[in-house]
């Protein structure tokens, strides 16, 4: 996505910040940044929300896990004590818990600070994890010993949106970004590995 963005918009001044959602919203409010790409649901009252993508979650396990042979898996089929989640405060964790309808997290014993750490733990046969659909292809190409299984719970499990201040004047810029992102995400989805 970034090479295409740079190619199509060579004069674009791009400042990429990876942060938790509430930090990004504060930066938008203060004018430190103009836009953010975020996963929803999240409380975005007081901001312009431009939704452009929906996706589901996939359960990631080693290929030798018998459950990975199925085309989909229900949340109740996954042992919480084997589930590797991201640390508290990460919206991906909140979205996964919500999609799986998990209220009591006391049995979840593995917490990783990043998704790449969670994947390394799965590769080491420590447990299993979930990833968003947009990450599946790249993940499986890099880790052929892993297998994705679609989470069979009502979806879509999350939405992706561009968030801006209410007084942001660049609606045409947002439309151009949405078109570019959607094109790239759609082309990525056509390349199925598993």
Where are these regions (language model features)?
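A late-sequence structural motif
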Residues: 148-189
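Central regulatory/effector-binding core of bacterial HTH transcription factors
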Residues: 1-45, 112
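A ligand-binding cleft/hinge motif common to bilobed small-molecule-binding domains
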Residues: 40-46, 94, 116-146, 154
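Short loop/turn segments at beta->alpha junctions
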Residues: 20, 74, 113-114, 132
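Short secondary-structure boundary segments
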Residues: 40-41, 63, 133-135, 160, ...
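Flexible hinge/capping segments at coil-to-helix
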Residues: 46-83
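Secondary-structure junction motif
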Residues: 67-68, 82-103, 170-179, 188-194
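Hydrophobic residues within well-ordered alpha-helices
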Residues: 28-29, 78, 120-127, 162
